[in-house]
Amino acid sequence: MCDMIESQPAQKIGKMKKLRRTLSDSFSRIALKKDENAIDEICVTKMSTRNCQGIDSVIKHLDPIPEDKKVRVQRTQSSFDPFEKTSNQPTSPKFGKADSYEKLEKLGEGSYATVFKGKSKVNGKLVALKVIRLQEEEGTPFTAIREASLLKGLKHANIVLLHDIIHTKETLTLVFEYVHTDLCQYMDKHPGGLNPENVKLFLFQLLRGLSYIHQGHILHRDLKPQNLLISDTGELKLADFGLARAKSVPSHTYSNEVVTLWYRPPDVLLGSTDYSTCLDMWGVGCIFVEMIQGVAAFPGMKDIQDQLERIFLILGTPIEETWPAVHSLPHFEPERFTLYGPKNLRQAWNKLSYVNHAEDLASKLLQCFPKNRLSAQAALNHDYFSDLPPRLWELSDMSSIFTVPNVKLQPEAGESMRVFGKNNSFSKSLSNSKH
C-alpha cells in the first residue's frame, strides 16, 4: 500500500523569508561563477532527495548555514543537452547564462511565472523557458526553489527534464526540455474516451514516473492532466513540481490546498495533512477513469462540499467501519453528508467494463480510506497490464517504453496517427503552478 511521509513542523514566517532570501542569494552567486562546472551543484537547505553529500569549497559563501542543513542536488543528465555542441559550431555562451537561449513566442503566463518557447543558441534545439519574477523583499519564491532542487536530482524518462537554471537580479529562469502537448489537450482533441491501448501505455508511464519519485520519498501533490506532458512520440512526462514535497523539504506546514479540486482525494478535502504517497494515487485513479470514459471522474461544480458529495455518491459515504478515524478529520461532519452506499464503478463509468481488469484497478485506486489505495509499484503489477511485453518492467529509469519492440501508440477513433500538434502544454502545466 502507500507509504507515509511525515509532516514537517511549522516554520515561523520570518525564518522562512530569511531562508528564501539566503537561497535566492545562493542561486545568484552560483549563476555568476566563472567556473562553468560550478552551476552543476546547487546548494539548497534540506532539499535533496537522493545522493546527499557534504558541501565543498565551491560554495563556502553559504558557511553561515549549519553543515547538517546543507545538501547537494546533482544536475540531471539526459539524452538531450541544450549545450551539446556540434563539430562545426564555435565556442558558445556558458552554461547558466541568459544569452545562451533565444526567446521565441510566449506560451503562457501565471501569477509569478511566464513560459516561453525558446531555442538553444548552441545547437538550435527547442526548450521551454519558465521565467519566474523575483520580488526584492521575498527573494526567490519558495516553490521555485523546491521545484528546481527536486528536478535537478531526478533522472527518469517519465519526468520532465530540467536542463539549466539561470538566475539574475530580476528573474529565475528554469530551462526545461520542450514537450509538444499535455494529456488535457490530447483528451480534448480526442473526446469520448481514448483508445484503450493508448490509455494503458499512458497509465503505465504515469505509474513508472510516480513509482520512481515515491521511492525517493517525494510526493507530486498536483496530479492532473495538465501536468502530464506528452511528446510527439507518445512519451508521458510528469511536470510542474512546484507543489511537490520531499520528506526533508521544510515548509510552514503541509497545506491541504493542493491538487485541483477534481483530482483532490477525500482525505485532503476533509482537512487531513497527514500526507502519504496515497495522495498521488487518488489522482492516478481519477485520471485513469477520465482517459477511458472521456469525462472527469468527479467534476465538482461548486465547492468542497459538492466535490465530496460527488465522491460519496459513487464510492459510498465513509463511516468508522470503512474508514477508521474518519470522525477525527477536521472537516468531517456526518450530518452534512447524505449516507450513500458504494456502487460498482461501471454503474458510473460504463466504459470500464469494456476493458479487462480496468474496473478492478480503478476500484483499488479510488479508495476513500487512503491506506487502502494501491501504491504505484503495486499498480504496475496489476493484471490490467498483463498483456504488455515483460521487457517493460526491466527498463532502466532513463529508457523510454517505446524502445521496446512493438510498443507504440495506436490511432485514436476516426484518426490516423500523426504528430499531436504544435500547441505546447507548458502554457498550462508550467505557468499555472504556484510560482
Curated annotation (Swiss-Prot):
Its EC number is 2.7.11.22. ATP binds at L107, G108, E109, G110, S111, Y112, A113, T114, V115, K130. The active site is at D222. GO terms for biological process: cell division; G2/M transition of mitotic cell cycle; regulation of canonical Wnt signaling pathway; regulation of cell cycle phase transition; Wnt signaling pathway. Residues 75-92 have a biased composition (Polar residues). Transmembrane segments: none annotated. Keywords: ATP-binding, Cell cycle, Cell division, Cell membrane, Kinase, Membrane, Nucleotide-binding, Serine/threonine-protein kinase, Transferase, Wnt signaling pathway. The keyword RNA-binding does not apply. It catalyses: L-seryl-[protein] + ATP = O-phospho-L-seryl-[protein] + ADP + H(+); L-threonyl-[protein] + ATP = O-phospho-L-threonyl-[protein] + ADP + H(+). Its main location: membrane. Gene3D superfamilies: Phosphorylase Kinase, domain 1, Transferase(Phosphotransferase) domain 1. It is found in: Cell membrane. Pfam families: Pkinase. It is an enzyme of class 2 (transferase). This is Cyclin-dependent kinase 14. The lineage of its organism: Eukaryota, Metazoa, Chordata, Craniata, Vertebrata. The gene is cdk14.
